[in-house]
C-alpha cells in the first residue's frame, strides 16, 4: 500500500512565489499572494497576478517583474514549470506525476477528504429559517433552510465549530392572530357563526387545529356563547375602526378578555402544534438545529428589559408621544425606532436587540444571520443597536436569501400566505423529492432570484442537474459492483498509468475539491459545491462513455477503478454537504 500525505499544491505554489518575492523584492515582504484556477488549460494549473499588482505600486514593467519572480522560484518536486502570460500573469504547471499520485491521497483520506483547517476551530452560530410558527413552512422558507443547512455543513468541513439555531418568534402579534383565527374556527364548530376576518389566518391547518380542539374539549372554550358572538360582531361591523389591522387587534383583545386563562391554553396549543409541524417538516428535509431559541424566554428572563436599560444608560433613548425611542439615526439608520410603545409593550425590535445581545454574550467568534431578502431594510437598525451596545458589529454577518419562484408547464405558480393558498415546503418535497429540492435551492447565489422549474426537477434526464450528478455516482457503483473486488485492492493502483487527458482532468478536479469547499465557506456560497459537482459529473460521464474499465490488463483495470472510486467518493461527499443522497443505483 502506498502511503501518501495529502498535498496542498496551491499553498505550495504560494510558498514558492513568496520565497521568490522575498528574494527579488526584499522590501515588499508580507504581500498577499492569491492563486486562481485559469479558465484555459494552456495557462497552467494555477495563475497569479502578483507581478501586475506589485508593478503598479513599484512603477515597474509587469512582464519584466514576472520574469524576475519566475527566475527566483525555488526548485519544486511537484511543479513542472512556471511561465509568463498576458500582461504579466505567472502561471504554474504541475508535474503529471504529482497529479497522478494525488489519487492515493484521496483514497486514503476517505470521507475526510476535502476537509480543511480554514476555520481553525473558531465558533460560528448560524441562525436560519426562524419562521413565525403561524403556519406550515412555505417554499420561501425552504430556500433559506436548504441554504443555511448546506452552508453549516460546508463551514463544518472547512474547520469551523458550527451551532445551528432557529429563533422561535413565539411572543409576537402573529401568534395572537393565529390563536384568534383558530378560536374563531372552533366557535364555528360549536355552532356559533361569525364573519371570519379577511386578514386572519385562513389555511386548512387552522381548521384542522380547531377541529382537534373541539374533538378533545367540546364546547369548553365557547364562553358565554351569545354574548361572545354579540361582542365579536360589534367589533367586526363597527364603522368607527380606522383599519382592518386595528379591527383584528380589537378582536384579539376581546378574545383574551372572554377566554381569560383559557386564552393561554389555546395560545400554547397552537404554538406547540405549529412548532411540532415545523420541526418535523425540517427534519424530513434533512435540516436540524442544535438550538431552538424562544423569543418569549427573552421576556421571561428579563433580557429585553436589560437590553433596553443598557441603551437608556448610554443616553440613547428618548420619549416621544408616550413611546420610548432608540436614537438609531446616530448609527446610520434612516430614522429612529420605537423600542417600547405608549401602552408599555416592547416592540419586536426591542426583543431583537435583546436576542442579539444574548448571541454576543454566548461567546461565539462569529455570528451569521440568514434572512429573507425582504428583511434588507432591517439590517441598519440591528447593526446600529449592536454598535450602540458597544459590541463589535464586525462579528455579525447577515446573508440575504431571495425567494424562490416556482414554475410548472412554463408558467409561474402563484403563492400567497394569509389566504392559505400558498405552496408549502412539504408540498414541494412531495412533488419533486427532497434531493431535487435541496439541490435546486442552492443552484444560484442566495441573493439572486431563483426560478425553480418543477418539471425539470422531476425529470430523469441529463438536463436535471441533481439527476445528472446522482447518475454519475450510481454508474460508478454499478461498475465497481460488476468488478466485485475488495476496495482495499484499489490501493495497489499504479497511478503512472493514468495518462489519458480525461483521466488527468478528473485528477485535477479532485485537487480542486478542498479549494472549492474553502471558497464556498469564505463566500457563504453553497452553489459553488453544486457547480463543482455538475462539472465533475460531466467529466466523469464523458470518461465513462469513452473508456472500458473491466479490461484484461489487471494493473490498468485496478488503476482505472481506483480513479472512478475516488470520483464516487467526492461525489458522495459533495452531495452530503448539500443534504442530498448519493444513490448506489438508479
From Swiss-Prot:
UniProt cross-references to SMART domains, sorted A to Z: Arg_tRNA_synt_N, DALR_1
GO BP annotation list:
arginyl-tRNA aminoacylation
GO-annotated molecular function:
arginine-tRNA ligase activity; ATP binding
PROSITE patterns annotated for this entry? AA_TRNA_LIGASE_I (PS00178)
The answer, when asked if Aminoacyl-tRNA synthetase is one of the entry's keywords, is yes
Q: Which reaction does it catalyse?
A: tRNA(Arg) + L-arginine + ATP = L-arginyl-tRNA(Arg) + AMP + diphosphate
Record GO cellular component, one term: cytoplasm
Q: Where is this motif: 'HIGH' region?
A: 131-141
Enzyme Commission code: 6.1.1.19
Localization terms from the record: Cytoplasm
Family, according to the entry, reads as follows: Belongs to the class-I aminoacyl-tRNA synthetase family.
Its quaternary organisation is: Monomer.
Q: Which NCBIfam families match?
A: argS (TIGR00456)
Show the HAMAP family listed in the entry. Answer: Arg_tRNA_synth
Q: Kindly provide the name given to this protein in its UniProt entry.
A: Arginine--tRNA ligase
Which gene name belongs to this protein? Answer: argS
Amino acid at each position: 500500500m502506498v502511503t501518501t500525505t495529502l498535498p496542498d499544491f496551491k499553498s505550495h505554489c504560494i510558498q514558492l512565489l513568496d520565497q521568490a518575492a522575498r528574494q527579488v523584492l526584499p522590501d515588499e515582504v508580507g504581500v498577499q499572494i492569491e492563486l486562481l484556477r485559469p479558465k484555459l488549460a494552456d495557462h497552467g494549473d494555477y495563475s497569479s497576478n502578483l507581478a501586475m499588482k506589485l508593478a503598479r505600486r513599484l512603477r515597474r514593467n509587469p512582464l519584466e517583474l514576472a520574469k524576475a519572480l519566475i527566475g527566483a522560484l525555488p526548485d519544486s518536486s511537484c511543479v513542472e514549470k512556471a511561465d509568463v502570460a498576458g500582461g504579466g500573469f505567472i502561471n504554474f504547471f504541475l508535474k503529471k506525476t504529482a497529479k497522478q499520485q494525488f489519487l492515493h491521497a484521496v483514497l486514503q483520506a476517505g470521507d475526510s477528504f476535502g476537509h480543511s483547517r480554514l476555520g481553525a476551530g473558531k465558533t460560528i452560530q448560524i441562525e436560519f429559517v426562524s419562521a413565525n410558527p403561524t403556519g406550515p413552512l412555505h417554499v420561501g422558507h425552504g430556500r433559506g433552510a436548504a441554504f443555511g443547512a448546506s452552508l453549516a455543513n460546508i463551514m463544518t468541513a472547512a474547520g469551523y465549530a458550527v451551532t445551528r439555531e432557529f429563533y422561535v418568534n413565539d411572543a409576537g402579534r402573529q401568534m395572537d392572530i393565529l390563536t384568534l383565527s383558530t378560536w374563531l374556527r372552533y366557535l364555528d364548530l360549536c355552532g356559533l357563526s361569525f364573519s371570519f376576518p379577511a386578514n386572519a389566518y385562513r389555511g386548512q391547518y387552522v381548521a384542522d387545529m380547531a377541529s382537534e380542539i373541539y374533538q378533545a374539549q367540546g364546547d369548553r372554550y365557547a364562553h358565554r356563547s351569545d354574548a361572545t358572538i354579540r361582542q365579536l360582531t360589534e367589533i367586526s361591523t363597527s364603522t368607527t375602526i380606522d383599519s382592518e389591522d386595528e379591527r383584528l387587534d380589537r378582536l384579539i383583545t376581546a378574545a383574551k378578555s372572554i377566554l381569560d386563562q383559557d386564552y393561554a391554553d389555546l395560545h400554547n396549543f397552537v404554538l406547540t402544534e405549529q412548532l411540532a409541524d415545523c420541526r418535523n417538516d425540517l427534519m424530513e428535509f434533512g435540516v436540524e438545529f442544535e438550538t431552538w431559541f424562544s423569543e418569549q424566554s427573552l421576556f421571561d428572563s428579563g433580557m429585553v428589559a436589560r437590553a433596553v436599560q443598557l441603551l437608556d444608560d448610554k443616553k440613547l433613548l428618548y420619549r416621544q408621544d408616550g413611546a420610548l425611542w432608540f436614537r438609531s439615526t446616530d448609527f446610520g439608520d434612516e430614522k429612529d425606532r420605537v423600542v417600547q410603545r405608549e401602552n408599555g409593550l416592547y416592540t419586536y425590535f426591542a426583543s431583537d436587540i435583546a436576542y442579539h445581545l444574548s448571541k454576543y454574550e454566548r461567546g461565539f467568534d462569529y455570528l451569521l444571520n440568514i434572512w429573507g431578502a425582504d428583511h434588507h431594510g432591517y439590517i441598519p437598525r440591528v447593526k446600529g443597536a449592536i454598535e450602540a451596545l458597544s459590541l463589535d458589529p464586525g462579528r455579525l454577518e447577515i446573508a440575504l436569501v431571495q425567494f424562490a419562484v416556482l414554475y410548472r408547464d412554463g408558467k409561474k405558480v402563484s403563492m400567497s400566505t394569509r389566504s392559505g393558498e400558498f405552496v408549502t415546503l412539504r408540498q414541494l418535497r412531495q412533488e419533486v423529492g427532497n434531493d431535487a429540492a435541496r439541490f435546486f435551492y442552492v443552484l444560484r447565489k442566495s441573493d439572486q432570484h431563483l426560478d425553480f422549474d418543477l418539471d425539470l426537477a422531476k425529470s430523469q434526464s441529463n438536463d436535471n442537474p441533481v439527476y445528472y450528478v446522482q447518475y454519475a455516482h450510481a454508474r460508478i457503483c454499478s461498475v465497481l459492483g460488476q468488478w466485485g473486488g475488495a476496495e482495499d485492492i484499489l490501493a495497489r493502483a499504479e497511478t503512472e498509468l493514468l495518462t489519458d487527458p480525461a483521466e488527468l482532468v478528473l485528477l485535477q478536479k479532485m485537487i480542486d475539491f478542498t479549494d472549492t469547499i474553502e471558497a464556498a465557506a469564505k463566500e457563504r456560497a453553497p452553489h459553488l459545491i453544486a457547480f463543482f459537482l455538475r462539472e465533475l459529473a460531466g467529466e466523469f460521464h464523458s470518461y465513462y462513455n469513452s473508456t472500458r474499465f473491466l479490461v484484461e490488463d489487471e494493473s490498468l483495470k485496478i488503476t482505472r477503478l481506483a480513479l472512478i472510486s475516488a470520483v464516487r467518493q467526492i461525489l458522495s461527499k459533495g452531495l452530503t454537504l448539500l443534504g442530498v443522497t448519493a444513490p448506489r443505483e438508479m
